[in-house]
From Swiss-Prot:
Species assigned in the record: Salmonella typhimurium (strain LT2 / SGSC1412 / ATCC 700720)
InterPro entries the UniProt entry points to: Bact_microcomp_CS, BMC_dom, BMC_shell, CcmK-like_sf, CcmK/CsoS1_BMC, EutK_C, WH-like_DNA-bd_sf
Biotech relevance: Artificial BMCs can be made in E.coli by expressing eutK, eutL, eutM, eutN, eutS (eutSMNLK) or eutS alone. Cargo proteins can be targeted to them and beta-galactosidase (lacZ) was active within the BMC, showing the BMC allows passage of substrate into the interior. This can lead to the development of tailored BMCs for specific metabolic reactions. The addition of eutQ to the eutSMNLK construct results in biogenesis of multiple BMCs.
The keyword Disulfide bond is annotated on this UniProt entry: no
Residue ranges constituting the EutK-Ctail domain according to the UniProt record: 108-164
Homology family: Belongs to the bacterial microcompartments protein family.
Entry protein name: Bacterial microcompartment shell protein EutK
Length: 164
């Protein structure tokens, strides 16, 4: 589950790169995606907690104003699952209401994931795990939930950590 989303629509590639750089430097957010809407018009999507998304959008808007034009910006706290699907891209074969089949936590997935989580003190969200391994979000969520139910992980909010 994504904690919060920040969307920033700008005119110009230079403004978009400048805004993305400023957003990532200003707050603890992750660039989830970007969309080129028209030639020269781009939308940047960041993920993080709500305060971080707001700070990132403030910094990104200021940077984009210096080199281009800001069309619009929006923060979305605790987005609905269908909204997450919409932001994640339309290329998924499943519809947002369908559940992906459970993917068992195979030993090689589990070992690699546990090693990664051991190196990240604050834990990781399913979205961060999916981005790191190049997995679909549902697969990452299923593997994390399987390890959580097996007692290997603890969960606080949307973050998974190694159980001490």
């Amino acid at each position: 589950m994504i904690n919060a989303l920040g969307l920033l629509e700008v005119d110009g590639m230079v403004a978009a790169v400048d805004a993305a750089d400023a957003m990532l430097k200003a707050a603890n957010v992750r660039l989830l995606s970007h969309q080129v809407l028209d030639p020269g018009r781009l939308t940047l999507v960041v993920e993080g907690d709500l305060a971080a998304c707001r700070a990132a959008l403030d910094a990104g808007s200021a940077a984009a104003q210096r080199t281009g034009r800001v069309i619009s910006r929006k923060e979305i706290g605790r987005p609905e699952e269908d909204t997450q699907w919409l932001i994640g891209g339309f290329a998924r074969a499943t519809t947002p209401t369908e559940k992906a089949p459970q993917v068992p936590a195979t030993p090689e997935f589990a070992e690699a994931l546990l090693a990664l989580l051991a190196s990240v003190r604050q834990g990781m969200t399913a979205g961060e795990v999916a981005a790191h391994f190049g997995w679909p979000l549902e697969q990452a969520r299923n593997v994390l939930e399987q390890l959580f139910s097996d007692g290997a992980l603890r969960k606080r909010s949307s973050r998974y950590r190694i159980k001490n």
